[in-house]
From Swiss-Prot:
Organism listed in the record: Rhodobacter capsulatus
Protein name per its UniProtKB record: Ion-translocating oxidoreductase complex subunit B
Source lineage: Bacteria, Pseudomonadati, Pseudomonadota, Alphaproteobacteria, Rhodobacterales
A cellular-component GO term for this protein: plasma membrane
Single GO molecular function: electron transfer activity
Induction field: Expression is reduced under iron-limiting conditions.
Ranges of residues in domain 4Fe-4S: 29-88
Amino acid sequence: MIAAAASMSALGLGLGYLLGAAARKFHVETPPIVEEIAKILPGTNCGACGFPGCNGLAEAMAEGNAPVTACTPGGRDVALALAEIVTVEAGADAGPIAEIEPMVAFVFEDHCTGCQKCFKRCPTDAIVGGAKQIHTVVMDACIGCDACIEVCPTEAIVSRVKPKTLKTWYWDKPQPGLVAASAETAA
């Protein structure tokens, strides 16, 4: 018994040392811009952008192969933050950032069979429900990646515009020329 425990411990320590040495030897340095972009992205790795996770999108943006608006779950705020980094440091053209309406999944409960394929596929656990029971989406947790829509066998899930609440609604900042012109006409 003691010999088995000692041999397993020695084997574990030896393999751990080999893994640590291999990690140091084969370490690949990532550019700092990729790390900056990855910090801004939501980190849900949903794949809605078409890249394998948020790090894949960050690498593509750093190389100039992906637009700053590729991350749909991040929305307008993430696109604006990425535009500042990518255009200044990578020299990529950000282009105009269109107003992206945040989307959420919606389940038609009369079509849902409770197969749980959407439940298993959701990266943020925004879908609730049990086996052979009707599922529903928690709108505050849904990021709009559409991963659940792809796997639904009965097409009971659709993507809808997220309803505006006091948390999500905002006014655009007024343009400086318009404010000055309206002040002059008022006087």
